[in-house]
């Protein structure tokens, strides 16, 4: 009969392959409840971290000195020969008593069974009380796996029932560097209490929250909403969706249209492109768009205008039909990758006036669609059947022979239309060769004289789509990497899981391609920045672009190392870990680059013209007088934006990383003149206006400017010209005097007006934190919060000095001091959050302080109202 409740140590890592099996790591200590449980030879029933399950016995080692009887089954290792006796030591026990309780004898430690405690002196020796009745702990394990010798503590204990850890005073002798734990008598069962540090090593441990929780404004206060599960889809703006009761794909029909009509259609949904001259197996067509768009049509009809950059189809021969076509579209959009529905949200927009009639559009996808959202493991790989962008449309013969291609609207900023010989023209989106890719990349960095930037709205949408693509592909790669590490398919080359390996390699390529697409967009924007009125914009954007290029090169290097290691004989688990660690930071880098482009979009791209384009517009990208859609891109260049702070120099705080945090401190309670002077200086600093505005989203600019005006408005302190809204009623006997009542009512109105400004500033601050804006953004908003609250402190200071009633002075002074303390806390936490960005804990602490400030200001207003009504 096997003994129960034996403590064992894990010799290797173990990954559970069934719900009944336990996962553990090397070095974990667990309780063996039963050996060879339920007739399963070699499987033991164990308990670890409060969970029970079966584990392979050959991955455990029974610890020393547990029981005084020999187990029924064989031990986990071969029996070792007894050690030779030494002078002054007890002889080892015979094999018949392998499990024996520890006796007060001397224990000779072995090299691998000694716990060293780095205690510098004897003064630091201490005793630690074990909570509750002590279990039978094991002594340090020996190299032998089945022979357990008697052990004797070197230091005597006053009582065998006392559960104390004896901490050795320091290195002195071989027997002093051991944890000696006396046995406990009378225990019916053993309980192993896992230290908290060991709990953190468990794979089931909880992870710290990676997202800052921002309270929601309810009335005049802020409360936290219930936690909502994270959404796995991208929200498409409502104004971009075509009207319809079902909100599904609006795909124009293809049957019954003449070729001339079909060529003028404008799609915002990538249709199914050409299958190729010989067709394809229908089982290989995995699309997320109804496939009947391209069925039954000759290839010549697929030359509509897209809002998504087309790419060269892998099924179409790379012949002269496509060599003469020139687009100003970055070539990275054509790189073939496995299609990920979550990465490419379909954005629909209303068709222009020259699109086909309304009766030719239906809201319901055609029946009998192909496979939708097929899991990656079930997809059949092919050279040209999996796409992340639509295929290239085939040109009609008259266009391929040298005709002018109809102009289109592309969601990528084209730097210029260049006059180049036919052999030097770049393909629309071909990046299959390194020479072609480098040629297109270099051409994007130099803008020619005929530069015509992209429209502002289209560029912003394309930038958001590219950023979302990077985030989605990285998330997909991390999921696959977790699956590969959990199943062990990547570390066990003897039994590889080919579908998972192929999906992992495809996900790595998808991440690299998504980052490359964003880089191509940014390179085009760099070319546009060279022609803007802001001369420093080109240098700033180039620095941001260089950081992203370094990230891309690192990803490519890790991906190549991963592929090379997989093909060779060496283990590649380390390569996979390095790639995953590098990929985790990619979404944040992409977000910073996209945020910078968003903030300067008004300078880099053309503003949308309000009126319909007419023939008197400027030059077009495709100078064809008969082309009806050529006037779409005839837009004048935008005028440079006007900044509200005209006195601040352009280069202020540009060369100093800490400049934007200078002067950001709250000192003592100031007087009125000093406060207004400091407030004016802070508002004129470029650290608030220019450095903050340069990275704000477009929809936040108006809110930022409105807050500037509200915060800069001084406090009205002229009581002579003030008239109360209602006549002052006589107070109760013993109440406030008329002068104090008038003073309270006057400053109560000032307090309510400034509370509105403070509430708006807090809302804008929470929005910046919730959208994970960089420090320069939320620090600028926190200054608005501090300046608005500082006005309330000034009101309280004025009342405490001018009021005659002692009760009024004491209460107002109390809340003024409270607001001062809260402002100091906000300054400290904001600095910490900026220096530790993007730490969620530091940002959450900052949010809590601002939320507490909002509640305290509301209490201050209520106290003023109660005092005025007394």
From Swiss-Prot:
Positions carrying Phosphoserine: 134, 139, 292, 428, 437, 639
Keywords annotated in UniProt: Acetylation, Cell adhesion, Cell junction, Cell projection, Cytoplasm, Diabetes mellitus, Phosphoprotein, SH3 domain, SH3-binding
Top-rank taxon, per record: Eukaryota
Signal peptide: none
Biased composition (Pro residues): 73-85
Modification Phosphothreonine occurs at: 269
Domain SH3, chain residue ranges per copy: 3-65
GO biological process: actin filament organization; antigen receptor-mediated signaling pathway; B cell receptor signaling pathway; cell adhesion; cell chemotaxis; cell division; cell migration; cell surface receptor protein tyrosine kinase signaling pathway
Family to which the UniProt record says this protein belongs: Belongs to the CAS family.
Name of the molecule in the record: Breast cancer anti-estrogen resistance protein 1
Gene: BCAR1
């Amino acid at each position: 009969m096997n003994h129960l409740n034996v403590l064992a140590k894990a010799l290797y890592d173990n990954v559970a392959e069934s719900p009944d099996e336990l996962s553990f790591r090397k070095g974990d200590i667990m309780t063996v409840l039963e050996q060879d449980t339920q007739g399963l030879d070699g499987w033991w029933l164990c308990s670890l971290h409060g969970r029970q399950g079966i584990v392979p016995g050959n991955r455990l080692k029974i610890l020393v000195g547990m029981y005084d009887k020999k187990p029924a089954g064989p031990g986990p290792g071969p029996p070792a020969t007894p050690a030779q006796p030494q002078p002054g030591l007890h002889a080892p026990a015979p094999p018949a008593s392998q499990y024996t309780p520890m006796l007060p004898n001397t224990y000779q430690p072995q090299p691998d069974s000694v716990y060293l405690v780095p205690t510098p002196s004897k003064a630091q020796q201490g005793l630690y009380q074990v909570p509750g009745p002590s279990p039978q702990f094991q002594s340090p394990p020996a190299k032998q796996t089945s022979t357990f010798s008697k052990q004797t503590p070197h230091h005597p204990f006053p009582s065998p029932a006392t559960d104390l850890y004896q901490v050795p005073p320091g290195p002195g002798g071989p027997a002093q560097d051991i944890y000696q734990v006396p046995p406990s008598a009378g225990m019916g069962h053993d309980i192993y209490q896992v230290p908290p540090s060991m709990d953190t090593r468990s794979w089931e441990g909880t992870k710290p929250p990676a997202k800052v929780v921002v309270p929601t404004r309810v009335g005049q206060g802020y409360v936290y909403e219930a936690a909502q599960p994270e959404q796995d889809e991208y929200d498409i703006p409502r104004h971009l969706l075509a009207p319809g009761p079902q909100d599904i794909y609006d795909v124009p029909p293809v049957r019954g249209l003449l070729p001339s009509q079909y060529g003028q259609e404008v799609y915002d949904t990538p249709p199914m492109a050409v299958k190729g001259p010989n067709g394809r197996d229908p089982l290989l067509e995995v699309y997320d768009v109804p496939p009947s768009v391209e069925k039954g049509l000759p290839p010549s009809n697929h030359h509509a205008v897209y809002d998504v950059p087309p790419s060269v189809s892998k099924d179409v021969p790379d012949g002269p039909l496509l060599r003469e076509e020139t687009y100003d579209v970055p070539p990275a959009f054509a790189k073939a990758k496995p299609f990920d529905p979550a990465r490419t949200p379909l954005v629909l927009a209303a068709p222009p006036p020259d699109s086909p009639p309304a009766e030719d559009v239906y809201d319901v996808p055609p029946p009998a669609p192909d496979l939708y959202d097929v899991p990656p493991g079930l997809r059949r790989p092919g050279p040209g059947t999996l796409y992340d962008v639509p295929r290239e449309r085939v040109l009609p013969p008259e266009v391929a022979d040298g005709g002018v291609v109809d102009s289109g609207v592309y969601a990528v900023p084209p730097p210029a239309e260049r006059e180049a010989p036919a052999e030097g023209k770049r393909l629309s989106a071909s990046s299959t060769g390194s020479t072609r890719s480098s040629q297109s990349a270099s051409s994007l960095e130099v803008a020619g004289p005929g530069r015509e930037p992209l429209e502002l709205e289209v560029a912003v949408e394309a930038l958001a789509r590219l950023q979302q693509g990077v985030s989605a592909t990285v998330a997909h790669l991390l999921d696959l990497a977790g699956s590969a590490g959990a199943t062990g398919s990547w570390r066990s080359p003897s039994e590889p899981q080919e579908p998972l390996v192929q999906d992992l390699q495809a996900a790595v390529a998808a991440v690299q391609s998504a980052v490359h697409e964003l880089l191509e967009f940014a390179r085009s924007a760099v070319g546009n920045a060279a022609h803007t009125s802001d001369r420093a914009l080109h240098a700033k954007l180039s620095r941001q672009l260089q950081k992203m290029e370094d990230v891309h090169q690192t990803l490519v290097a890790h991906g190549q190392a991963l592929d090379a290691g997989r093909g060779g004989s060496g283990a590649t688990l380390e390569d996979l870990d390095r790639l995953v660690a590098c990929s985790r930071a990619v979404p944040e880098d992409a977000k910073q680059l996209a945020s910078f482009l968003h903030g300067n979009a008004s300078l880099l791209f053309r503003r949308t013209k309000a009126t319909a384009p007419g023939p008197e517009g400027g030059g077009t990208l495709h100078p064809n007088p008969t082309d009806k859609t050529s006037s779409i891109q005839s837009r004048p260049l935008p005028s440079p934006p006007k900044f509200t702070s005209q006195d601040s120099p352009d280069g202020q705080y540009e060369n100093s990383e800490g400049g934007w945090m200078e002067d950001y401190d709250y000192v003592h309670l100031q007087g009125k003149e000093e406060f207004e002077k400091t407030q004016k200086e802070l508002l004129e600093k470029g650290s608030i206006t220019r450095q903050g505005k340069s990275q704000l989203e477009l929809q936040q600019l108006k809110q930022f400017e409105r807050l500037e005006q509200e915060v800069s408005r001084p406090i009205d302190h002229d009581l002579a010209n003030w008239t109360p809204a209602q006549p002052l009623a006589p107070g109760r006997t013993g109440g406030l005097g008329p002068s104090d009542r008038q003073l309270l009512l006057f400053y109560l109105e000032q307090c309510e007006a400034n509370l509105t400004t403070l509430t708006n500033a807090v809302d804008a601050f929470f929005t910046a934190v919730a959208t994970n804006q960089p420090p320069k953004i939320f620090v600028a908003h926190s200054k608005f919060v501090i300046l608005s609250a500082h006005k309330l402190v000034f009101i309280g200071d004025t009342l405490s000095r001018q009021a005659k009633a002692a009760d009024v002075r004491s209460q107002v002074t109390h809340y003024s001091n409270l607001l001062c303390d809260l402002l100091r806390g906000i300054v400290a936490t904001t600095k910490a959050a900026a220096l530790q960005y993007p730490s969620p804990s530091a940002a959450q602490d900052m949010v809590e302080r601002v939320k507490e400030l909002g509640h305290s200001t509301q209490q201050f207003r209520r106290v003023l109202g109660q005092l005025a009504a007394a």
